[in-house]
UniProtKB/Swiss-Prot annotation:
Localization: Cytoplasm
Stored CDD domains: RNase_HII_bacteria_HII_like
Pfam families in the cross-refs: RNase_HII
Name under which the protein is recorded: Ribonuclease HII
Task of the protein: Endonuclease that specifically degrades the RNA of RNA-DNA hybrids.
Biological process, per Gene Ontology: DNA replication, removal of RNA primer; mismatch repair
Length: 235
């Protein structure tokens, strides 16, 4: 009797997932959990099996130019897609995890077609009224999640480039809001802008120092005014 050889495992990238029920499947991912500034952005994508997109992968593994090209192709070829965000105010009020899940929920609710299954990158699920499953490293394993990661990343990067025009002193077009040495140095020099997340430790530290310095600065201004008045009276 011939022995049966075991089949080789599927490659780790873009594996076919056999548990999908029949119907539309949406992939969901986010961008912007780690940065010190700006919203967290989420995207939901339902791909068209009859209109495949070559080169989908985790957005972090792609160059900026490749992400931009795929962004346009995804928007053109997907059955539907939706992009949503949670604001800086919501991040500071809810915390970054809950704000991320809120953005994901908004993205799914924004789809014009309702999926029967939602596949979410990571190990946490937003509150949804459809079946959902969290997949660790899903942005490398599931094409729809890869597509969502690209839409979310490009959308947030474009937001950072617009923010740079408003606040060029922080260099948002380069670090995209992440806590690089250059960004932290700009924070210390210029303080926090309106788009910085006050509950994130580096920003909270800068804000607290600024608040402690306010009474001292006010006292110096008052003393200078009193000195000027005294000089006028003595003249």
């Amino acid at each position: 009797m011939r022995s049966r050889k075991s089949l080789p495992p599927l490659p780790p990238e873009q594996a076919c997932l056999p548990w999908h029920p029949p119907g539309l499947v949406a992939g969901v991912d986010e961008a912007g959990r780690g940065p010190l500034a700006g919203p967290v952005v989420a995207a939901a994508v339902i791909l068209d099996d009859l209109n495949p997109i070559e080169g989908l992968n985790d957005s972090k593994k792609l160059t900026a130019a490749r992400r931009e090209a795929l962004y346009d192709e995804i928007r053109a070829k997907a059955l539907c897609c939706s992009i949503a965000e949670a604001s800086v105010e919501e991040i500071d009020r809810l915390n970054i995890l809950q704000a991320t899940l809120l953005a994901m929920r908004r993205a799914v609710l924004g789809l014009r077609l309702k999926p029967v299954l939602v596949l979410v990158d990571g190990n946490q699920l937003p509150v949804l009224d459809v079946q959902a499953e969290a997949i660790v490293k899903g942005d490398s394993l599931v094409q729809a999640i890869s597509a969502a990661s690209i839409l979310a990343k490009v959308t947030r990067d474009r937001w950072c480039e617009r923010l740079h025009e408003q606040y060029p002193e922080y260099g948002f077009d380069g670090h995209k809001g992440y806590g690089t040495a250059a960004h932290l140095a700009a924070l210390r020099l210029h303080g926090a802008c309106e788009e910085h997340r006050r509950t994130f430790a580096p920003v909270a530290h800068v804000v607290s120092i600024a608040r402690m310095a306010e009474p001292l600065a006010a006292a110096r201004v008052a003393a200078a005014a009193q000195g000027a008045q005294a000089l006028l009276l003595s003249a």
